[in-house]
C-alpha cells in the first residue's frame, strides 16, 4: 500500500503481515515491545532537525508501523509529544545503536522544547550492542543494520544514503512531492521492518545457558552432540581444530574430535612428588620413600606428571580441573572421554556450554 502523509506531524500507519520473529528474547508479551528509528538532518540535536520517527509494534496479531512525520519542517514539538505519549504504553524500546544516537538525540530535543518525557519506565534494548559481538563469527566487514539484515535475508524495497535522504526531505518541504515523500517513508519503513527482522540476534548470548542436549552419537573419530537452542536468526557455522558447529532455527550440532593416545597429567602439588627419570613419570613422596635415591629426583612443575593412554576429547578453554596435555607436536588440552560425556545429562550439557562459550559469549 502507498504511504501517505496528509498534514503536518501526520500519523501514517502501515500493516505488516510478512514478518514473523521470536520476540521472547525481549519479552514474553509482544505487546510490551516498541521498535523505533529516527531520521534527522544531522548528527547533532542542537544543529539539526528531527523530521521522522518510525515506530513498530505488535497489534492484533500483526506488526504495524507508525510514522510521526514533520511534514512542514516546523512540527518537531508535535511529533516529539506524540512519541512521548506513545512510548508510555510500552516496557521495552528496541533500536539499533539507539543508546548512542537515537535516544540521546530525542532527549536533547525534548529538553529544547520543554516536553516532559521520561525513559525511566521503559527499558532500552539496543540490538547493535549484541550484533557487534558476533562480527567475527559472521565474517562481517561492518555491523551496520543493513549488514545484519543481509544475514537474515531481509530485503529492503529501496536503499537511500543518509545524505540523499536529507536532501530529499529539504526538497520535499519546498515542493510537497509525493514521490519524495514515498521515498522518505519507504526508507524509514525499511529501517523499522529491518530492525524487527533482526530481533533474534538477541538470542545469541542466550544459547549457552539455555541449550539442552537432545542426542549424543559416537564414531571412532568424532562425538556429535545435538542440542536445542533459542530461535536463531540465521544459519551459523563455525570451525576450529577442537570443534565444528552447525546451527539453524532451534537446533545446534557440535562435532568434537576424539583421539586415543598417551597424554600427560600434571600434579598441582608438585612439591609432594618425586620424578623417576627411568620411568618418565612422577610418584607421590609416600611411595618414593621406597625408591633408591639414585633413581629419583625432586619433581618440578615441568616433571610432576604421570602418563596415561586413553581416549580423549578437547577441554574447554577455561577448564582447570582434570586436564591432560598432548605430548605430541601439536600440543593441546584434553579431558578423558568418560561415560558421562557420551550420554545425555548435566555433565554433557555443561561440557557443551563451556566449549561453545568462546563462540557465543
Predicted regions and their residues:
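Conserved DEDDh/DEDDy metal-dependent 3′-5′ exonuclease domain
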Residues: 63-141, 326-361
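Polyanion-binding interface signature
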Residues: 209-329
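Single conserved hydrophobic/aromatic residue that forms the stacking wall/gate
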Residues: 1-9, 13
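Short glycine-biased active-site loop of nucleotidyltransferases that positions the nucleotide triphosphate
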Residues: 4, 43-47, 137-140
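Conserved RNase H-like, two-metal-ion catalytic cores of nucleic-acid enzymes
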Residues: 18-89, 240-247
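Acidic active-site catalytic centers that drive phospho-/nucleotidyl reactions
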Residues: 8, 37-39, 102, 126, ...
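Residue-level signal for well-ordered alpha-helical scaffold segments within enzymatic catalytic domains
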Residues: 55, 82-85, 104, 108, ...
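Acidic, Mg2+-coordinating catalytic module of metal-dependent nucleases/exonucleases
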Residues: 138-139, 144-212
Amino acid at each position: 500500500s502507498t504511504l501517505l502523509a496528509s498534514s503536518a506531524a501526520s500519523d501514517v500507519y502501515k500493516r505488516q503481515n510478512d514478518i514473523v520473529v521470536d520476540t521472547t528474547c525481549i519479552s514474553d508479551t509482544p505487546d510490551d515491545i516498541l521498535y523505533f528509528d529516527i531520521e534527522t538532518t544531522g548528527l547533532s540535536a542542537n544543529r539539526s532537525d528531527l523530521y521522522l520517527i518510525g515506530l513498530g509494534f505488535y497489534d492484533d496479531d500483526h506488526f504495524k508501523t507508525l510514522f510521526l512525520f514533520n511534514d512542514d519542517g516546523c512540527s518537531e514539538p508535535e511529533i516529539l509529544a506524540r512519541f512521548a505519549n506513545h512510548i508510555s504504553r510500552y516496557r521495552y524500546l528496541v533500536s539499533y545503536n539507539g543508546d548512542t544516537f537515537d535516544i540521546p538525540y530525542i532527549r536533547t530535543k525534548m529538553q529544547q522544547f520543554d516536553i516532559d518525557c521520561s525513559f525511566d519506565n521503559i527499558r532500552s534494548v539496543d540490538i547493535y550492542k549484541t550484533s557487534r559481538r558476533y562480527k567475527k563469527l559472521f565474517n562481517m566487514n561492518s555491523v551496520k543494520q543493513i549488514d545484519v539484515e543481509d544475514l537474515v535475508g531481509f530485503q529492503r524495497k529501496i536503499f537511500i544514503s543518509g545524505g540523499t535522504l536529507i536532501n530529499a526531505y529539504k526538497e520535499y518541504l519546498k515542493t510537497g512531492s509525493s514521490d519524495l515523500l514515498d521515498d522518505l517513508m519507504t526508507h524509514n519503513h525499511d529501517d523499522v521492518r529491518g530492525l524487527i527482522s533482526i530481533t533474534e540476534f538477541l538470542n545469541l548470548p542466550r544459547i549457552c545457558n539455555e541449550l539442552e542436549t537432545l542426542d549424543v552419537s559416537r564414531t571412532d573419530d568424532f562425538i556429535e552432540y545435538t542440542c536445542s537452542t533459542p530461535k536463531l536468526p540465521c544459519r551459523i557455522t563455525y570451525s576450529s581444530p577442537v570443534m565444528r558447529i552447525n546451527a539453524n532455527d532451534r537446533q545446534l550440532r557440535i562435532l568434537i574430535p576424539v583421539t586415543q593416545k598417551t597424554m600427560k597429567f600434571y600434579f598441582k602439588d608438585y612439591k609432594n612428588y618425586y620424578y623417576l627419570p627411568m620411568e618418565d613419570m612422577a610418584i607421590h613422596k609416600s611411595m618414593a620413600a621406597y625408591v633408591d635415591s639414585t633413581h629419583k629426583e625432586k619433581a618440578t612443575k615441568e616433571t610432576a606428571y604421570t602418563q596415561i593412554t586413553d581416549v580423549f576429547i578437547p577441554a574447554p578453554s577455561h577448564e582447570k580441573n582434570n586436564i591432560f596435555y598432548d605430548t605430541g607436536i601439536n600440543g593441546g588440552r584434553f579431558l578423558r572421554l568418560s561415560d558421562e560425556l557420551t550420554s545425555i545429562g548435566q555433565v554433557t550439557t555443561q561440557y557443551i556450554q563451556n566449549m561453545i562459550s568462546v563462540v557465543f559469549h
